Amino acid sequence: MTGTTLAATYGPISGADLEAELAQPRIADGDAQDAAVYERDGGAHAPPDGDRADVRRAAGAGDASVRLTRVSKRYGERAVLADVDLSIGRGSFVSIVGRSGCGKSTLLRLVAELETPSAGTLVKRGDGGGALDTRIMYQEARLLPWKTVLQNVMLGLGRRAKDDARAVLDEVGLLARANDWPAQLSGGQRQRVALARALVHRPQLLLLDEPLGALDALTRIEMHALIERLWREHRFTALLVTHDVQEAVALADRVLLIEAGRIAFDQRVPLDRPRARASAAFAALEDRVLQRVLTGSDAAPAAPNAAGPEGASRGRAAPASGLRWAV
């Protein structure tokens, strides 16, 4: 059976990934070739096995730091990002919003080092200036369908990591499904497994590329609470790309808007956690960000104490409850 045939059967895993998996030599421990498939897509430059334990220990002692200086990205003649300057504080949660094609996911891929800048510099520093373990979650869970839930979480770690994998499955509420197949899970449960697979490595930086975009509204809210709880417990740095402005405000300390390849808006979110979505302060801040995305101007009233002096009202905006998506 070819990788193309398997891709048609199993969907989210691309044909190229499966071809790579099938081309690997079969050895006693099948985790090695499966891990190669995972590391290329979701491992985002994971360290070699021998270094992984040291990185996990460092992650427990410090947080991630990312700095971009005049970073640009071009594909041929088309400029996607232009002169981006961005500093992401250690342990912070940053959301990126913007219209389709503005460069959000390209920026995330640059931070993941899945692509390289055309110009400028990108620096990632772990604790004490050491290596920075980075993991990435996509909209598709990208689970290997021939592996159980537990085996998917253990990819790249070997059988000695079973206790760690079971512990993180317990954290995401899926320990009872450890021996099930991915096909037996709902979409939200598959994303929980993908989250567990990232967190078992104890990353210092977690990149989220619209991971909840395909889920229903109630499941999204449950996942928001889970991601926030785990972020607060593990204190990794999080960078989220999303089309959903409400999601961005609910999760982040800071919301960035990308327009025409540049950071056009940088909004702090000083609301208490957990966020009360029905509160006037939350609604006003969400509305301000959304109006900035839609109109290109800061027309909405700011939440009290949320935006500083620049948040003064300059016009009447549509209710935030009626508009959420920046597409």
Swiss-Prot record:
Q: Where is this region: Disordered?
A: 21-54, 300-327
Stated EC number for the protein is 7.6.2.14
Q: Which SUPFAM superfamilies match?
A: P-loop containing nucleoside triphosphate hydrolases (SSF52540)
Keyword set, alphabetical order: ATP-binding, Cell inner membrane, Cell membrane, Membrane, Nucleotide-binding, Translocase, Transport
Which topology term describes how it sits in the membrane? Peripheral membrane protein
One GO term describing the cellular component: plasma membrane
What InterPro entries does its record include? Answer: AAA+_ATPase, ABC_transporter-like_ATP-bd, ABC_transporter-like_CS, ABC_transporter_ATP-bind, P-loop_NTPase
Q: What class of enzyme is it?
A: translocase
Catalytic activities:
ATP + H2O + aliphatic sulfonate-[sulfonate-binding protein]Side 1 = ADP + phosphate + aliphatic sulfonateSide 2 + [sulfonate-binding protein]Side 1
Q: How does it assemble?
A: The complex is composed of two ATP-binding proteins (SsuB), two transmembrane proteins (SsuC) and a solute-binding protein (SsuA).
Q: Which family does it belong to?
A: Belongs to the ABC transporter superfamily. Aliphatic sulfonates importer (TC 3.A.1.17.2) family.
Against PANTHER family, the record matches this protein to: ALIPHATIC SULFONATES IMPORT ATP-BINDING PROTEIN SSUB (PTHR42788:SF17), TAURINE IMPORT ATP-BINDING PROTEIN-RELATED (PTHR42788)
Which function does this protein serve?
A: Part of the ABC transporter complex SsuABC involved in aliphatic sulfonates import. Responsible for energy coupling to the transport system.
- What is the name of this protein? Aliphatic sulfonates import ATP-binding protein SsuB
Give the species this sequence originates from: Burkholderia pseudomallei (strain K96243)
